[in-house]
């Protein structure tokens, strides 16, 4: 591995740095965007059961808010459960926007890495080409220099794509996951509002 890094030259280091950041972000988002963490199945029914038993007590609100993003949304609704339907819905929407923003955390960075990695690889390619052509004039010059320039160009191009392709795949996956989870939370919040106001059984 170290021999590859040496052959790729100094332009490879920004790509290595970007790959480490991308890997860390991918692992963090895989862990944080799990269904069981964001919007557990059956949470609304459990919250409504607790509401019927204890009412909208501060303990219930605090307990619900600690159950992840969906819990925060439902807690906002419970805090206004005795208010008119539009007020309760507005409170849920306000918190919902904040929760949706939190779910998208780090995705901009991951998307930027996916877009920039090929450009960093292209930069390494240009550096390698400069080394190749810069070593041409003198007759009988060291043949190792052009070979090193070729390796710099090819390794950086390849590594740029290696970083960019998985980053883009996971970026698209996480965007779709966030949209799906946001829709799920919206449906659960609507269910809470309708059940709390007797509009649904």
Give the residues covered by each predicted segment.
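Hydrophobic membrane-targeting segments
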Residues: 1-44
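Membrane-interfacial hairpin junctions
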Residues: 2-3, 135-148
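Residue-level signature of catalytic and energy-coupling elements of molecular machines
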Residues: 9, 23, 59, 74, ...
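Alpha-helical transmembrane segments of integral membrane proteins
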Residues: 12-25, 111-118, 124, 163-167
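Predominantly long cytosolic amphipathic alpha-helical stalk/bundle segments
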Residues: 38-123, 127-141, 170-201
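Cytoplasmic-entry segments and transmembrane alpha-helices of multi-pass inner-membrane transporters
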Residues: 108-113, 144-157
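Hydrophobic alpha-helical transmembrane segments of polytopic membrane proteins
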Residues: 152-169
């Amino acid at each position: 591995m170290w021999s590859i890094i040496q052959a790729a030259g100094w332009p490879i280091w920004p790509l290595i740095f970007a790959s480490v950041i991308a890997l860390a972000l991918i692992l963090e988002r895989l862990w944080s965007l799990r269904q069981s963490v964001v919007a557990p199945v059956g949470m609304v029914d459990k919250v409504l059961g607790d509401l019927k038993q204890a009412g909208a007590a501060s303990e219930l609100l605090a307990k619900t808010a600690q159950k992840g993003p969906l819990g925060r949304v439902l807690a906002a609704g419970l805090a206004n459960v005795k208010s008119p339907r539009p007020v309760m819905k507005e409170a849920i929407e306000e918190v919902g926007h904040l929760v949706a923003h939190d779910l998208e955390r780090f995705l901009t960075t991951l998307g930027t890495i996916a877009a920039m990695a090929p450009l960093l690889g292209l930069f390494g390619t240009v550096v390698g080409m400069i080394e190749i052509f810069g070593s041409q004039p003198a007759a009988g010059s060291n043949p190792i220099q052009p070979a090193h320039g070729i390796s710099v160009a090819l390794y950086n191009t390849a590594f740029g794509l290696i970083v960019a392709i998985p980053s883009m795949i996971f970026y698209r996956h996480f965007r779709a996951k966030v949209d799906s989870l946001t829709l799920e939370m919206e449906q659960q919040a609507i269910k809470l509002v309708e059940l709390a106001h007797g509009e649904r059984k």
